[in-house]
Design a protein with these regions (language model features):
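Short, solvent-exposed loop/turn segments at secondary-structure junctions
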Residues: 43-44, 82-83, 101-103, 139-141, ...
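Catalytic beta-strand/loop cores that center a nucleophilic Ser/Cys/Thr
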Residues: 28, 167, 171-250
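N-terminal secretory signal peptides and thylakoid transit peptides that target proteins
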Residues: 2-19
């Protein structure tokens, strides 16, 4: 019990200061919670892993929310391209794309498209420091025009003339296998120190719809390559090439993995850790040493595979 007035005043002053400190600490803690915008509009083919039904989030969203709960960030999901024109867009620490096609068109899923200004706002934001994570079909997005139905333009190296989105991302999807569409291949771990890959033994056998890609930015830091030696089909008649990488786009941290087609892969620890490490790096929660290693990790990266032969009827 506090008896004298002076002691009571000192006690109350200490309580007030302590209370203010706790309130400030609480506000700072809340302010430190970073948010990731999951954007899954499909102007082209709509993948099963991003399909939603009323009250049921997509496979990708479920995995990302699980990672968010473990790692202390938040996730908001949308298929509405108008988000990039809104003030809300600028509140995110990173965006996560699993998308297809020209997102400035309504396209397959009929959700509101991005505007041309919204696309530019995205690119400007990443250059200014927004994190960007792309999975699988994020490289099947904003193909360098024209993009005819026979995909012939995808077999041409456009280099600096590639679409600005693809330059930001670091590479472009050409095609994937047909028969078989899925193959188990050896994934070579080029950077076992990148977040999420600690303790992983290389190579890793992984079943996937493997994207064959081109127009790699030469400044990418290759994290994973796929070994094509045992793979079958025209898309893989090429040397090993990058399937997961990181790069800086101005001040923005960009991470991409070509994997993620199969629903079951979004539950496999190896892949979940790859995605989680990429997100945590993109939002700045962990660091990584980036080296421009594409010429060492994949010396034949620039080889473009042969086109599929015409289908006979």
């Amino acid at each position: 019990m506090i008896n004298d007035a002076a002691s009571r005043r000192e006690f109350l002053r200490a309580m007030a200061v302590g209370g203010a400190g706790l309130a400030l600490s609480s506000r700072l803690s809340a302010a430190k919670t970073k948010s990731v915008l999951l954007f899954t509009k499909s102007s082209g083919f709509e993948h099963a892993v991003i399909k939603t039904t009323p009250g049921n989030p997509s496979v990708v969203e479920k995995t990302l929310r699980g990672l968010a709960k473990q790692r202390g960030f938040e996730v908001n999901a949308t298929k509405d391209g108008r988000i990039f024109d809104s003030p809300e867009f600028h509140s995110y620490a990173a965006v996560f794309f699993f998308t297809t096609g020209d997102l400035t068109t309504e396209g397959t899923d009929k959700n509101p498209p991005m505007t041309v200004a919204g696309k530019q706002a995205l690119l400007d934001a990443v250059k200014g420091g927004l994190g960007f994570v792309g999975a699988h079909a994020a490289s099947d997005t904003f193909h360098t025009p024209p993009d005819p139905q026979d995909n012939s333009n995808r077999y041409i190296a456009h280099g600096e003339q590639s679409d600005p989105y693809l330059r930001m991302l670091g590479g472009e999807f050409i095609t994937h296998g047909r028969q078989p569409r899925l193959q188990t291949a050896d994934v070579i771990v080029d950077d076992p120190k990148f977040p999420g890959l600690e303790g992983v033994t290389s190579p890793v056998k992984f079943n996937e719809e493997w994207y064959s890609m081109k127009d790699f930015m030469t400044d990418i830091h290759v994290i994973l390559t796929v070994d094509t030696k045992t793979m079958t089909g025209e898309p893989y008649q090429r040397p090993p090439y990058p399937v997961t990488w990181a790069r800086m786009h101005g001040k923005g941290r960009v991470f991409y993995t070509a994997m993620g087609d199969l629903a079951e892969n979004w539950e496999i620890p190896f892949f979940v850790n790859v995605v989680g490490g990429g997100v945590r790096w993109a939002i700045g929660d962990v660091s990584a040493k980036l080296t421009q290693n594409i010429k060492e990790a994949a010396p034949g990266y620039a080889v473009i595979p042969p086109k599929f032969p015409p289908e006979t009827k």
